[in-house]
Design a protein with these regions (language model features):
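Formylglycine-dependent sulfatase
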Residues: 1-173
């Protein structure tokens, strides 16, 4: 696929998906969270689950939620002191553990696909994970120039990142 938003069904309508192959072999198939970029692009799952109760950015801080409700981008990251399950990836992990136990008890073959959204902008995670690293001990690379030997397609202007409130619209990131 050449674009991030390509549809499996539209681009390759006759392809036998991995999910369909497993179903054809008698497997129970479960999809938890983001497996393909487009939600519900593969129709063959026995069960397809998404934790999205509100916007996909899954902000938890009051300021970011307020900005998003106004149609604005919030900050590129947040680190509130909250439980893992407040974020979608925590919910996904918990649901997948429950599914694994259930599937094991059933004793039949299964294919469980588990998709985590992170690392993806915005870089939101509970404070305890940010506390594992001291910002002062993280060394940035000395050379941030674009390599002449790299393909042009690799060069970009940080477009997605620049949408966020705390990132400059131009210049160094």
């Amino acid at each position: 696929f050449l674009k991030f938003n390509a549809s499996i069904k539209k681009e390759t309508p006759t392809i036998l998906t991995l999910v369909k192959h497993f179903k054809n072999q008698g497997y129970t198939t479960i999809s938890n969270n983001k497996i393909t970029h487009l939600k519900r692009d593969i129709k063959e799952w026995d069960e397809e689950w998404y934790p999205y109760e509100k916007g996909w950015r899954n902000y938890q801080s009051k300021e970011n939620i307020r900005l998003e409700k106004k149609g604005q981008h919030g900050y590129a990251y947040e680190n509130p002191d909250i439980d893992d399950a407040a974020y979608y990836d925590g919910k996904t992990a918990n649901k997948s553990i429950v599914d694994l136990k259930k599937l094991k008890a059933e004793g039949k073959p299964f294919f469980l696909a588990v998709g985590f959204v992170k690392p993806h902008l915005p870089f939101n995670a509970p404070k305890k994970y940010w506390d594992l690293y001291k910002e002062s001990e993280i060394t940035l690379p000395k050379n941030t120039s674009f390599s002449n030997s790299a393909p042009e397609i690799a060069n970009h202007s940080w477009g997605e990142l620049r949408y966020y409130k705390d990132i400059p619209k131009k210049g160094q990131v």
